[in-house]
Swiss-Prot record:
This is U1-lycotoxin-Ls1b. Keywords: Disulfide bond, Knottin, Secreted, Signal, Toxin. InterPro entries: Spider_toxin_CSTX_knottin, Spider_toxin_CSTX_Knottin_CS. Residues 1-20 form the signal peptide. It comes from the Eukaryota. One of its GO terms (molecular function) is toxin activity. The presence of a 'disulfide through disulfide knot' structurally defines this protein as a knottin. The keyword Repeat does not apply. Belongs to the neurotoxin 19 (CSTX) family. 04 (U1-Lctx) subfamily. One of its GO terms (cellular component) is extracellular region. Pfam families: Toxin_35. Disulfide bonds join C44-C59, C51-C68, C58-C86, C70-C84. The lineage of its organism: Eukaryota, Metazoa, Ecdysozoa, Arthropoda, Chelicerata. It is found in: Secreted.
Length: 107
């Protein structure tokens, strides 16, 4: 049973790491924005801070880079706006949990 947990933890970690290293599909205007803001990208955005204007500028966490997660907010006037924040995706949280559990058992 322990071997199965270790193998599953390794697979989840590898899959999560490979998906976090891949570049998300960039639109042309986002790519131009990234090139124009090269200096501001060097200062990363901490977890739970707004990343609406710089969607690829989130800092790294313990194991993975935080992802800019966006939601659509509807105001009382009925106007929709997009708000984004740096956070840990659920599959990264699961991988960190498994690794932390493995460290407690083996280490």
């Amino acid at each position: 049973m322990m071997k199965v947990l270790v193998v599953v933890a390794l697979l989840v970690t590898l899959i999560s790491y490979s998906s976090s290293e891949g570049i998300d599909g960039l639109e042309a205007d986002e790519l131009l924005s990234l090139m124009a803001n090269e200096q501001t990208r060097k200062e990363c955005i901490p977890k739970h801070h707004e990343c609406t204007s710089n969607k690829h500028g989130c800092c790294r966490g313990n194991f993975f880079k935080y992802k800019c997660q966006c939601t659509t907010v509807v105001t009382q006037d009925g106007e929709q706006t997009e708000r984004c924040f740096c956070g840990t995706p659920p599959h990264h949280k699961a991988a960190e949990l498994v690794v932390g559990f493995g460290k407690k058992i083996f280490g």
